[in-house]
């Protein structure tokens, strides 16, 4: 086990995380499958619609690594896009679009790791209303 003094105090401290390197790896690992109508790259001043119920869910940014990571260190898709778009004069519009499921037992299961701050929540609005909101955000 070793001497307690030799143990690192906090392996997830901000001082130990190499965010620039992690972002570089993420950038290099993305694959563009098809660029229809030469959509990409987006203009720096583009208006972007982000649609999805997990856009602000830090634990879901970790994916299957959620048991080994700390969601407080995760940057959500919405926060990351908002920062990138705002600094370049663009605009990000968000719409939920849908619920993940209508089954309460599934919602409880999906929140078992973060029961104190659930990320999978139910929007009481009708599906048609959420879809209409998403379509409006994309226009």
Predicted regions: what they are:
Residues 1-139:
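Preference for extracellular/luminal or secreted protein segments
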């Amino acid at each position: 086990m070793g001497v307690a003094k030799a143990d690192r105090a906090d392996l997830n401290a901000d001082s130990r995380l190499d965010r620039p390197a992690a972002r570089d790896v993420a950038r290099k690992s993305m694959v563009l499958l098809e660029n229809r109508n030469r959509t990409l790259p987006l203009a720096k001043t583009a208006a972007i619609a982000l649609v999805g119920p997990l856009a602000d869910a830090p634990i879901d940014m970790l994916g299957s690594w959620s048991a080994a990571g700390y969601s407080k260190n995760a940057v959500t898709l919405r926060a990351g896009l908002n920062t990138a778009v705002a600094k370049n004069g663009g605009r990000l519009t968000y719409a939920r679009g849908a619920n993940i499921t209508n089954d309460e037992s599934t919602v409880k299961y999906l929140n078992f790791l973060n029961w104190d701050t659930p990320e999978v929540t139910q929007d009481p609005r009708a599906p048609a209303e959420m879809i209409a909101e998403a379509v409006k955000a994309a226009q």
